[in-house]
Structures are given as C-alpha cells and as structure tokens.
Curated annotation (Swiss-Prot):
Originating organism: Eremothecium gossypii (strain ATCC 10895 / CBS 109.51 / FGSC 9923 / NRRL Y-1056)
Signal sequence segment: none
Stored InterPro entries: Slx9-like (IPR028160)
Family per record: Belongs to the SLX9 family.
Short name of one Pfam family: SLX9
Gene that encodes the chain: SLX9
Recorded GO CC terms: 90S preribosome; nucleolus; preribosome, small subunit precursor; small-subunit processome
Superkingdom of the source species: Eukaryota
Predominant place of localization: nucleus
Role description: Involved in ribosome biogenesis. Required for normal pre-rRNA processing in internal transcribed spacer 1 (ITS1). May be involved in the movements of the replication forks.
Start-end of Basic residues biased regions: 1-18
Coiled coil: none
Subcellular location(s) per record: Nucleus, Nucleolus
Protein's name in the database: Ribosome biogenesis protein SLX9
An example molecular function term from Gene Ontology annotations: G-quadruplex DNA binding
Amino acid sequence: MVAKKRTQLRAKAMRQRRNSSEAMETEELPPDPKAFLHQLRESKREKQLNRSQSFLNRLRDQAGNGGISKSALRRRKKRMKEELKPRMEDLLTSLKEEGVLEEDESGELAAVTGVTAITASNGYSGLHDTAEACGTVRIRKNEPSIRTQRGAKLLTTKEQERFTKVISNERFRSSPFETLREIIKSRK
C-alpha cells in the first residue's frame, strides 16, 4: 500500500475543521434562562488562594505605612482630633463678634441683656410666692422622667399634691385667675 502525502492529509483535516466550526456557529443556542439561578461554587483550592491573596494584600498595605508604628499613628490621629476641637479663646472672640458678650469699663465681660439667664430650681418645694423676672429659665434637677411608667406615676402624685395646695390656698379662693397666673409665672 502506498502512503498518502502528508500535505493532502493536512488539507483534508483543515477542511473538516472548517466545516465543523461553521456547523457549530450555526447551531448556537439561546442563553440558558436558569444560568444565574445557581450560586457559583468555589472550590477549596480557590478559597485558599483567595484567603492567602487577601492576607498578602493586607501585609502590603501595612508595609506601605512607611514603617510607622501603631502608637505613632494613634498619636497622630489624636493630635489631629485635638486640632479640630474649638479652643475657649476662639469661642470668646466669636461671642464678642456676635455681640453676645460686651466688655465693661472694668475690663470684665458681661452678658448682653437679650440673653436668657438660667437659674437653678428648688423643685416642688411649696408654691412660689414671687414671680420671677421675665427671660429666666428654671432648671429642674432630679425630677422623675415622664417617659417611664414609674416616673409618670411619681409626677402625677406630685401634681395632685400641688393641685390640692393651690385649691386650698386663700388667695386662690379670692381671685382664682390671678393666683393661677402667678403660679404659672413662678413655674416658668
């Protein structure tokens, strides 16, 4: 038997490949609608590679700090925070500029009269006989919170006691509206 030439065999193989690739191109199917429904599974080897790669990246990032220790970085951050905080001198100058504080002849700073004065309260210790000056705010300390059940209960009992005191007051019997007005002013 006579052997065929290699060139003829190569040409024949090339023709067959072309025909098969053309057939494959014409037989393309539409994309699978369920292709993205399943979660991609990562093999054990891929997981190990991902972990090692992330660890190496983290090491490179830490090495990129220029050899600065953690404590030095912490001190830098703390210093930057302190620089951002307002200083009392800055606050004083801004209050002067806004007109909230004015200097007297003696050189001391005094609040302008338009600013509300804050006074401490002595709570529910009886009725206040004198009305306070206008523009004051009472600070009530150690009062129960109305938001809690126990606090609301305590506040209602205190209010009931105060109500009975107001009603039993002689001035209330003579002029109720005037007395109520004074009591409301005293609670302000």
